[in-house]
């Protein structure tokens, strides 16, 4: 579901203070300003147990690997950015992260049917987070190992 005030955010703790703060203080503000949209997983008492945020963006063709560049125009390439992504510590290691990403992928495929969206981008905080995304098929940018991408076309065929 899209985050709204009906969901309890106060007790959410993913172990990362910046992500906790984003959910509790900034996510709804950013939605109100049309900067990002945050989606939540919640339990039967409407406590948020995981979330991700999506925003539109673009990347330069030249930032991508040469194998990707060949088929792309020389203007900015439209993307959807998974900006924030977290699972409460009580639910980590139980597949909640992968379930949230599957949900995000479905939303992104829906968006791609309405507007041009070539890639999903993520900006990983560290190597461990980058490894998580790589296990799901993401690739690192050649010059920025913690910025990763996945083609939307690969999702469309997989979903």
Residue ranges and their predicted role:
Residues 1-15:
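Conserved N-terminal entry element of GNAT/NAT acetyltransferase domains
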Residues 49-50, 91, 106, 112, ...:
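Short Lys/Arg-rich amphipathic alpha-helical segments
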Residues 51-84:
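Conserved acyl-donor/pantetheine-binding loop and adjacent beta-alpha core of acyl/acetyltransferases
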Residues 83-93:
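A short, internal acetyl-CoA/4′-phosphopantetheine-binding micro-motif in the GNAT/acyltransferase core
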Residues 93-107:
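Conserved acetyl-CoA-binding loop-helix of GNAT-fold acetyltransferases
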Residues 101, 126-129, 145-152:
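Short glycine/proline-centered loop/turn elements that form peptide/ligand docking sites
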Residues 109, 115-117, 123-143:
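Conserved active-site alpha-helix within GNAT-family acetyltransferase domains
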């Amino acid at each position: 579901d899209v985050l709204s005030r009906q969901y309890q955010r106060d007790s959410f703790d993913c172990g990362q203070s910046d992500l906790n703060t984003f959910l509790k203080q900034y996510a709804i503000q950013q939605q109100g300003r049309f900067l990002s949209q945050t989606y939540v997983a919640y339990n039967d008492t409407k406590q948020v147990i995981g979330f991700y945020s999506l925003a539109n963006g673009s990347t330069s063709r030249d930032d991508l690997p040469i194998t990707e560049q060949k088929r792309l125009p020389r203007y900015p390439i439209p993307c959807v950015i998974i900006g924030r992504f977290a699972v409460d510590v009580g639910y980590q290691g139980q597949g909640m992260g992968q379930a949230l990403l599957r949900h995000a992928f479905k939303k992104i495929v829906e968006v791609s049917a309405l507007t041009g969206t070539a890639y999903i981008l993520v900006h990983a905080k560290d190597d461990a987070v980058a490894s998580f995304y790589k296990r799901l098929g993401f690739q690192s940018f050649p010059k920025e190992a913690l910025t990763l991408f996945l083609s939307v076309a690969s999702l469309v065929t997989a979903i």
